[in-house]
């Protein structure tokens, strides 16, 4: 009975934000439809492109599941960081920062997320996929963070399940850098999608890249769904970013790192630097 009550409470908490997201998708579709109508009436060639609605049954299911994933996530601010199983995406051996390859022609070595953590340095963990526009649009900003703060922190990009697979809840191609990736059928598909992302966006060599396993254990443990960023320090969650896409904020990560860097000169308690913006 207690478990049923907890599930009901979580559902009631989710409903208002779920409906607000549905309203946003409806408004978005209306604006895009109006734009297509204007272009059609003006006989513009741009109107000939395919119009993809965002407010669909598949979209509603994905949005609802994303809120459930966030509500039931294992990770909590100040709590132990889940040591999820992941697949390491190895760099190429030709010395090029932008060259990546899979080991044995398939996937890299299986390891764990905290294998990349150093007890003396914070680990910034950035979760996302190629078909998530808010994530890919922030990759250049993430690269700058890596370049600027790699002297005091480590960085890890975790490639997860596609947010908008082309054979699922597909997003409209809003920019030339948009990706079309199908649902991952196996680990090789997921690693290949990660390679495709890294071929398009050259990440600094200081940033390690891994892919979530096909059981999506990292995605579930950290409640990612679309995108999320967190900071692990001494095996604990020192910063927990909000649920993407609306509360995915790298600027707050920059602020945390600036505070953390200052802490080296003027020691403060870890609690003073901890921030939680998750909903």
UniProtKB/Swiss-Prot annotation:
Topological type in the membrane: Single-pass type III membrane protein
Catalytic reactions on record: 3,3',5-triiodo-L-thyronine + iodide + A + H(+) = L-thyroxine + AH2; 3,3'-diiodo-L-thyronine + iodide + A + H(+) = 3,3',5'-triiodo-L-thyronine + AH2; 3'-iodo-L-thyronine + iodide + A + H(+) = 3',5'-diiodo-L-thyronine + AH2; 3,3'-diiodothyronamine + iodide + A + H(+) = 3,3',5'-triiodothyronamine + AH2
Gene3D superfamilies to which the protein is assigned, alphabetical: Glutaredoxin
EC number of this enzyme: 1.21.99.4
Coiled coil: none
Tissue: Highly expressed in liver and in various parts of the brain including telencephalon, hippocampus, cerebellum, and brain stem, and weakly expressed in thyroid, lung, and small intestine. Not detected in skeletal muscle, heart atria or ventricle, gizzard or kidney.
Active site per UniProt: 132
Transport in keyword set: no
Similarity comment text for this entry: Belongs to the iodothyronine deiodinase family.
Complex and partners: Predominantly monomer. Can form homodimers but homodimerization is not essential for enzyme activity.
Name used for this protein in its record: Type II iodothyronine deiodinase
């Amino acid at each position: 009975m207690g478990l049923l009550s907890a599930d009901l409470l979580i559902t009631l908490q989710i409903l208002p934000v779920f409906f607000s997201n549905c309203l946003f998708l409806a408004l978005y579709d209306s604006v895009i439809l109006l734009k297509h109508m204007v272009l059609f009436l003006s006989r513009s060639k741009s109107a000939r492109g395919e119009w993809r609605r965002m407010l669909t049954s598949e979209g509603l299911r994905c949005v609802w599941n994303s809120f459930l994933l966030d509500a039931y996530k294992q990770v909590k601010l100040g709590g132990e960081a889940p040591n999820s199983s992941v697949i390491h995406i190895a760099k190429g051996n030709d010395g090029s920062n932008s060259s990546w390859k899979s080991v044995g022609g398939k996937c890299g070595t299986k390891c764990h997320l905290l294998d990349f953590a150093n007890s003396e340095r914070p680990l910034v963990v950035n979760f996302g996929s190629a078909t998530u526009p808010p994530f890919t649009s922030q990759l250049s900003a993430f690269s700058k963070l890596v370049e600027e703060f790699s002297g005091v922190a480590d960085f890890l990009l975790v490639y997860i399940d596609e947010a908008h697979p082309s054979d699922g809840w597909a997003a409209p191609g809003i920019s030339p850098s948009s990706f079309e990736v199908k649902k991952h059928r196996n680990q090789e598909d997921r690693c290949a999608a990660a390679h495709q992302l890294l071929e398009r966006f050259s990440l600094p060599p200081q940033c390690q890249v891994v892919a979530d396993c096909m059981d999506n254990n990292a995605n579930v443990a950290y409640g990612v769904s679309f995108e999320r960023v967190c900071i692990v320090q001494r095996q604990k969650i020192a910063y927990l970013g909000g649920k993407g896409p609306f509360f995915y904020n790298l600027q707050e990560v920059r602020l945390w790192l600036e505070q953390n860097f200052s802490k080296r000169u003027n020691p403060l308690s870890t609690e003073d630097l901890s921030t939680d913006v998750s909903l």
